[in-house]
Amino acid sequence: MRMRKKPNLIPRMDRCRDRMIPDPVELRGHWRDLMPQARELRVELGCGKGRFTAETAGLEPDVLFVAVERVPDAMIVAMERVVEKGLSNVFFVDGDAARLRDYFSPGEADRIYINFCDPWPSNKHARRRLTHENFLVLYRGVLRDGGQIHFKTDNRELFEYSLFQFPKAGYELSEVTRDLHGNGVCGIMTDYEEKFHDLGTPINRCVGTKLHLEQEPKFRPIAGPRDLAPQDGSKVLAEDR
């Protein structure tokens, strides 16, 4: 099942064009020029319809947020949410996680959010998981030392797999929970998260902090965006996030 096409997508995108970064490569190393007063630069991978993006940015107006999403029909909803709230600290990139090192220079990002990514359950597709060791090594190339990855998923198998991957890639784990909202709602939810929480599905969360290493783990170039595209029937659609 693919996401439903949004009507009037092009004119709607045009109305939000000041929130879109058409060529993120040109801003590599200069993102803070967009918001010189920003105390942090945070990147969200797969913002979906942007509820988490907009609400988090609204609570932290002194933080610069860059939301990366490759599904235009989802991204337009996120952009409209941001524009409706009058937020000036959020920008969007129509791009792919595999190209983060093209978009950001070493140490440029303070935090990365990964919320409810595709679990890619088949072992033969393990390298496509956004928490595979190789992706986590890729993120090291844009995070500062001490920078963090905040990861949430409803998929227990993906979560347990990820807990094994983070230390291998040079991150210290903290705030590990397998039932984030067990004692009441904790933090800002995505649309997808709220839906499954209401159904009684436990939400898993952890934080990985980038450690300084004398020798960086070897990064193996990742396949192009087309090879990383979600399969039909993927559990987590951009429409849901």
Name each model feature, range by range:
Residues 1-38, 173-241:
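SAM/dcSAM-binding transferase cores
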Residues 45, 68:
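Conserved beta-strand/loop positions that form the S-adenosyl-L-methionine
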Residues 46-50:
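Class I SAM-dependent methyltransferase "Motif I" SAM/SAH-binding loop
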Residues 71:
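Conserved SAM/SAH-binding beta-strand->alpha-helix loop
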Residues 80-106:
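S-adenosyl-L-methionine
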Residues 131-145:
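A short glycine-rich, Lys/Arg-flanked "PGG" loop and its adjoining helix->strand segment in the class I
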Residues 146-153:
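Conserved beta-strand signature within the Rossmann-like core of class I S-adenosyl-L-methionine
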